[in-house]
């Protein structure tokens, strides 16, 4: 597990969790500094002690082999894994060189010692100086704050205002120092990935020059050296991009910290001074307090930054009432009283300022809670995935592929913003939608056209690959097994809405054509991933963790481009269950990790050879085939009985197999046989046995036979074969446009759902969400704003500020 990311928004809160996270980063820097010192010492010993060359080299190799890199985040890219393993590779090379009894080492001091000393003194030393400054400002701020809060409210207003201004200045300075220190720590942690390894690589290269007997070994080392150099350069390039993004975020936090505050599960949190009664008077103890409006739970953690830790046990109480203290009733300022259900007496608390007290009062006195809004930083504009949107993208793609497919830096070089906006305004004109592709784009530069395409995708109300699936795509990219990555992303793409998937397919086919011409345009698959990753998978909120995930967004786009034919033209296999994924990861981790040069996917690499298409093995037995033939014959006879079907029937949507509405209505919510496939993640409404529409009666008459036959087959199959049943049914859906009637709910239920207002509902059973669009809950949970969803058998409701899908027969309306 890597180091947790340090969020700039936590600098303002200065919470205990933030302090603990900061300590872990400081400990890692101290460990790195200590290791560099030891490495430098061993290197000097290697240069000076030729007689003990063998033992010195083995000690040096052992030191390299024992050190482990710690990267920010919960997963590593292929480049980072390659760099992290490089020290072990170096150790193995040194052991082999020891067998050859090499005796000559020259220029090792300049190549190895000087850069490491420079990194340790300039980078780690700067981080230590920043820590001293940060600790000093922490003590100064806390002392000033305590002194300020001890001022009597009876003093003159001018004196109080002057004191308030002074505290604000000290607080602002402390906040800026905190941000700069966090930024420096993040920078050093990222720099060590390349500034630390590069000198070692150069040192090894120097050794190969003077070792005649190591020539063959150096030749064998060439492939790994090349891959490692690419990985280091890629890491350096990502660092430059990430550093600018983090620096931009830090500046935004300085200008408006509240706007970029991270989403918190608590309605309100922060430091409060709690009055504690003693035998002789009272004392005020600093606590870090959190409050949840839904449960009315107040948690108080005694914590003082100056002492460096907790001062007692945590305490949680249930809020009964909250009342502001009158100014003349207590000497302290900014005070309010809290009554608890499970604790006698009144708890008097002191906020840090008048504004802070107002926020706490608003959160506790029954007013509407203040939540962080997930505002998209991109302008929504009027961009939509409609006919005009598809026309715009097709026109841009046509212009690029006919006039500029070989232009260097395609999609990387941006056009002039004013011309891009002008082109977009022309393309988004409804009149332009009917014109041919070349009529509009022929007069524009290719870089303007490519910038217009990217800008239009960024102007969509949400990213093309949707917020709700973003974490799933990132998790898929973090899987160690390449085949599992592709399989997971394949499954996720087919869970996207139809228009999103069509647009994504159109774009990926085009990007594959661009990558095929990379020798002319210099845009490899990896480079295209860097360009389109943040656009197609832009984060919902701007945080350091989101910036760190950009590298995995790029990997997702690479996989989509390289496997676009398989992903978009074939139906995904049954997704792995959580247990299978865990087993797959365990097997992958237990086996010896492959050499860096043999990994099939890196963040930046040349276009790989064409992958062989995987042949899918059929799992449908003879029973399923008989069901298919019987159902087809009945449907054909039924369609012949309906020559006068409404013309609108042909446009009705075909049911998607991701959520069949024919499953039993009330399975046991804790059934151990319930699979983790999203199709069976929750029950749906039962099948209708009759219909009020005479036009659909012949089709509906087939329902009993088809679903009875399917049910008989399903009961005899293992869960892993269930996907084949619905794949079979989908095969003859296009031939019978009215087949969707088999899956429809009764018209009465539809009318009832559509007329149902937003209401509250209570959960009858517990349910664990299988994907991001669903809600997890326990029995007895109460949902707000419950209303019908577009998914048959599912409702949409809100729980703890999150909106998602709820199984219809798991709840009852209140």
UniProtKB/Swiss-Prot annotation:
**Could you tell me which residue ranges the BAR domain spans?**
7-262
The record places the site described as Arginine finger at: 412
Which InterPro entries did the record assign? AH/BAR_dom_sf (IPR027267), BAR_dom (IPR004148), GRAF_BAR (IPR035483), GRAF_fam (IPR047234), GRAF_SH3 (IPR035481), PH-like_dom_sf (IPR011993), PH_domain (IPR001849), PH_GRAF (IPR047225)
Phosphothreonine carried by residues: 670
All copies of the Rho-GAP domain together span 383-568
Q: Which of UniProt's keywords are assigned here?
A: Cell junction, Cytoplasm, Cytoskeleton, Endosome, GTPase activation, Membrane, Phosphoprotein, SH3 domain
Post-translational modification, as annotated? Phosphorylated in a PINK1-dependent fashion promoting retrograde mitochondrial trafficking and clustering.
Domain SH3 residues, every copy: 756-814
Please identify the protein, giving its name as recorded.
Rho GTPase-activating protein 26
Tell me the lineage of the source organism.
Eukaryota, Metazoa, Chordata, Craniata, Vertebrata
């Amino acid at each position: 597990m890597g180091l947790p990311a340090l969020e700039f928004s936590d600098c303002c809160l200065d919470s205990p969790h933030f302090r603990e996270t900061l300590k872990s980063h400081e400990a890692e820097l101290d460990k790195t500094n200590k290791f560099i010192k030891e490495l430098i010492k061993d290197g000097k010993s290697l240069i000076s002690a030729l007689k003990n060359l063998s033992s010195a080299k083995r000690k040096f190799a052992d030191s390299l082999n024992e050190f482990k890199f710690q990267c920010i985040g919960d997963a590593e890219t292929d480049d980072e894994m390659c760099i992290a393993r490089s020290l072990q590779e170096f150790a193995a090379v040194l052991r082999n060189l020891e067998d050859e009894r090499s005796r000559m080492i020259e220029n090792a001091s300049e190549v190895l010692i000087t850069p490491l000393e420079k990194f340790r003194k300039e980078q780690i030393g700067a981080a230590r100086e920043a820590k001293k400054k940060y600790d000093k400002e922490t003590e100064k701020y806390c002392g000033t704050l305590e002194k300020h809060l001890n001022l009597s409210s009876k003093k003159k207003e001018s004196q109080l205002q002057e004191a308030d201004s002074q505290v604000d200045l000290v607080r602002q300075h402390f906040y800026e120092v905190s941000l700069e220190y966090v930024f420096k720590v993040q920078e050093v942690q990222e720099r060590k990935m390349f500034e630390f390894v590069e000198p070692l690589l150069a040192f090894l290269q120097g050794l190969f020059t003077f070792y005649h007997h190591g020539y063959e070994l150096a030749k064998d080392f060439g492939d790994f050296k090349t891959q490692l150099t690419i990985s280091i350069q890629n890491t350096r390039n990502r660092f430059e991009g990430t550093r600018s993004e983090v620096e931009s975020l830090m500046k935004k936090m300085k200008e408006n910290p509240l706007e970029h505050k991270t989403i918190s599960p608590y309605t309100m949190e922060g430091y409060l001074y709690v009055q504690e009664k003693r035998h002789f008077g009272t004392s005020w103890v600093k606590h870090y307090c959190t409050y949840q409006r839904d449960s009315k739970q107040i948690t108080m953690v005694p914590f003082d930054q100056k002492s460096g830790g907790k001062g007692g046990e945590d305490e949680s109480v249930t809020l009964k009432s909250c009342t502001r203290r009158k100014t003349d009733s207590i000497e302290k300022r900014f005070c309010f009283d809290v009554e608890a259900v499970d604790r006698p007496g009144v708890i008097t608390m002191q906020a840090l300022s008048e504004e802070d007290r107002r926020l706490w009062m608003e959160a506790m006195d029954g007013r509407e809670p203040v939540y962080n809004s997930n505002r998209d930083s991109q302008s929504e504009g009027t961009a939509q995935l409609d006919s005009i949107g598809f026309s715009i993208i097709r026109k841009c793609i046509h212009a690029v592929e006919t006039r500029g497919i070989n232009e260097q830096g395609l999609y990387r070089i941006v056009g002039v913003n004013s011309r891009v906006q002008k082109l977009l305004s022309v393309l988004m004109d409804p009149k332009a939608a009917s014109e041919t592709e070349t009529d509009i784009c022929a007069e524009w530069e290719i870089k303007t056209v490519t910038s217009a395409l990217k800008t239009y995708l960024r102007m969509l109300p949400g990213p093309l690959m949707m917020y709700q699936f973003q974490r799933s795509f990132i998790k898929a990219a973090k899987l160690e097994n390449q085949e599992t990555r592709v399989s997971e992303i394949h499954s996720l793409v087919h869970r996207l809405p139809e228009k999103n998937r069509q647009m994504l397919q159109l774009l990926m086919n085009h990007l594959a054509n661009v990558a095929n011409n990379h020798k002319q345009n210099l845009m490899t698959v990896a480079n295209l991933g860097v360009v389109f990753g943040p656009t197609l998978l832009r984060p919902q909120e701007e945080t350091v963790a989101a910036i760190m995930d950009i590298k995995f967004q790029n990997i997702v786009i690479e996989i989509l481009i390289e496997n676009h034919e398989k992903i978009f033209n074939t139906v995904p296999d049954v997704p792995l269950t959580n247990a299978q994924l865990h087993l797959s990861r365990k097997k992958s981790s237990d086996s010896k990790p492959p050499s860096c040069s043999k990994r099939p996917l890196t963040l930046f690499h040349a276009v790989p050879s064409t992958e062989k298409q995987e042949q899918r093995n059929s799992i449908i037995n003879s029973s399923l085939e008989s069901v298919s033939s019987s159902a087809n014959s009945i449907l054909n006879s039924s369609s012949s009985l309906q020559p006068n079907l409404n013309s609108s029937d042909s446009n009705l949507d075909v049911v998607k197999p991701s959520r069949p509405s024919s499953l039993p209505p009330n399975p046991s919510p804790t059934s151990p046989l319930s699979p983790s496939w999203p199709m069976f993640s929750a029950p749906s409404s039962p099948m209708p046995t009759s219909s009020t529409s005479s036009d659909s009666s012949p089709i509906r008459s087939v329902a009993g036979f088809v679903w009875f036959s399917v049910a008989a087959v399903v009961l005899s199959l293992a869960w892993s074969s269930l996907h084949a049943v619905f794949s079979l049914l989908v095969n003859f859906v296009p031939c019978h446009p009215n087949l969707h009637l088999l899956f429809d709910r009764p018209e009465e239920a539809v009318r009832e759902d559509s007329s149902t207002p937003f209401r509250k509902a209570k959960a009858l059973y517990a349910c664990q969400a299988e994907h991001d669009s669903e809600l997890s809950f326990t029995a007895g949970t109460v949902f707000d704003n419950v209303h019908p969803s577009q998914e048959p058998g599912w409702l949409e409701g809100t729980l703890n500020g999150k909106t998602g899908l709820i199984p219809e027969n798991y709840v009852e309306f209140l």
